[in-house]
Amino acid sequence: MPLLHPGDTFPQLTLSIPGAQAIQVPGWFDREFGVVLFNRGAWCPYCTAQLRAFQRAGDSLTQAGIRVAALWVDDEKTTAEFTARHGLTFPLGHSADARAVAALTGAFVNEDPLYLQSTGFVLDPRGRVIVSVYSSGAIGRLVPEDVIGLVRYLREHAAASA
């Protein structure tokens, strides 16, 4: 279970989206900065808070050129209901194979019941990891304000050095 470090190419993951065509990240980010979030499930209040925070920051993320995609092990029905209830406009993938995702990304897995622990990645426009945040439990995760600030910082410094 290798951890992904800054500069590593993010592995291709397919996210099954309720009622829509599956997407593949990092390609879905379409040469923009990307955020990939792994969440424990709809039952987790910390996961709900994180996903709602990224939804509330949607306009700011868009203005900063950042796209968001998330996934968890919950089934399609639960994911569709959660997405509708919280008005998520970014893709939330369902029925993730926790062990397969962990093998590709190094995410921590809870065995019983089986789910991914909170994990987050910020990717550059070429699909390389800028930051990886691994949690072994309920807390410790990316927040949208930090992601926006980081991307703005990177853009400002790239422009200054060009």
Placement of each model-derived feature along the sequence:
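Chalcogenol-based redox active-site neighborhoods
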Residues: 1-162
